[in-house]
Amino acid sequence: MKILLTVPVTSFVSDPPNFPDLGLGYIAASLKNKGHEAHVRDWNMDPSHEKFKVWLMENRPEVIGIKVFTKDVAATQKTITIIRETLRGTTIVIGGPHPSASEPTDLMNDFVDCDFAIRGEAEESFPFLLSEIKNTGLKDAKPEKERYKNIPGLVWRKGGDVFSNPISLCHNLDNIDFPCWEMINPKDYFFDMLGSTLKEGYISPIITTRGCPGKCCFCCVHKISGRKIRYRSPSNVLKEMSLLYNKYNVKKFMFMDNCFTSHKENLIKICEDILKEKMIIEWDFVSYEKLDNLTDATLSLMYRSGCRMIHLGIESGSEKTRKVMNKSTSLKEITEKVKVIKDNGIKVGAFFMIGFPEETIKEIRETTNYAFSLDVDLLKFTICFPLPGTQNYDYIKEKYKFSIINWASFNIKDSPYPVSQLSSKELNRMLNVISLRLCLLNARKIVIRKIMKAVRIFK
């Protein structure tokens, strides 16, 4: 079957896409392995409804899979409308973070014109669904429950009823095909790694694990990939890195998984194998969890193998707010770890959010003061967004006394349901003040760097 895998056609709600979508790449590889003709299109690279219509008419895919983030619900609804107007007989399947975290009935009510949703990991489910559609036809008279009952994570409707199957996860990640890199080629994206000194080569995301045991109040990743961490073997990771390095000229890697450093032996083996293979690369990663494995010895090895930056998901500088978030690492530990990382030559980025449940101006000021006190190379602030499947989502349902949320009304910068004691307008005002402070700080750093460079030149 001919399949289009895509994101919704949308104007940039937050940041434009900087690098390939791993999820679509994994699904494309799975479909290709089953003999399907898969196409991946990132319409955020050129968000034109007219070009989308032309592509649909010229290629006429039989099935279209759309990856949906909560911030893109309205754009997805519009994209589905365009598909229905252009290709009436096409089967539409939605998947990704928002469907995975949403209640099945609420989800299908929000997307009345889609045929199916897949929750959780779809490498097995999507080909299974296509096989069922191909063999029996979408309008087959066979009872709905019998036709689809064995497809993990599937959600579908029949008349006024919505049916759903339990999510199933792949436990041996080495058995999953690498993403279909020829369809999500890193050379098509224009992005550079912060802290990088390499002047050549492309940048690519990669993951080494799935799942996260964390219970952060703002995160729904456990709804997609579970709480148990599943690991790829270091040899499997290096095999994919070598493919990207040798075939696609990738010299910079971003490890995107939540728990990259959770298995110390795997982390060390990956670093040692990079050195053994003599790969001239640079890489970074984000750490949302405990920092115990980032010791002096490990950080030294990481630096020698190419690690140039570590992004820390600190989120808040208020101990009170951190308890609400279910973060167990203390601010004292974080401050000490930042110094250890920097002492080993690795740059540090820090992510913070404002607007947590019942957070006041006092706690937000504690966060900003702590953030600006850290010796880090990058600071980034965002507003906490109540995603489905999170404790924050349950909190706003109780606070605002409703059972159904109009996700299409959500905007990543202006939620109609703020979770803190501040309104969306007040939170945005505070974020603007923080952004101005960041600009002044960055300008100061640039001036200092130029002065130091001039001093070295004239010595």
Which residues make up each language-model segment?
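N-terminal [4Fe-4S]-dependent radical SAM core
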Residues: 4, 11-12, 151, 157-205
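C-terminal accessory regions of radical SAM enzymes
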Residues: 4-13, 153-158, 162, 362-459
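Glycine- and acidic-residue-enriched helix-capping/strand-helix junction motifs
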Residues: 12-24
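A general structural detector for well-ordered alpha-helical segments in enzyme core domains, enriched
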Residues: 27, 52-55, 75, 79-83, ...
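Glycine-rich beta-alpha loop elements in corrinoid/cobalamin-binding modules
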Residues: 30-169, 383-385, 389
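Residue-level signal for the nucleotide or nucleotide-sugar donor/cofactor binding architecture
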Residues: 47, 121, 171, 232, ...
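Conserved C-terminal portion of the radical SAM core fold
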Residues: 47, 63-65, 91-93, 238-241, ...
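Radical SAM [4Fe-4S] cluster-binding motif and immediate context
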Residues: 179-349, 369
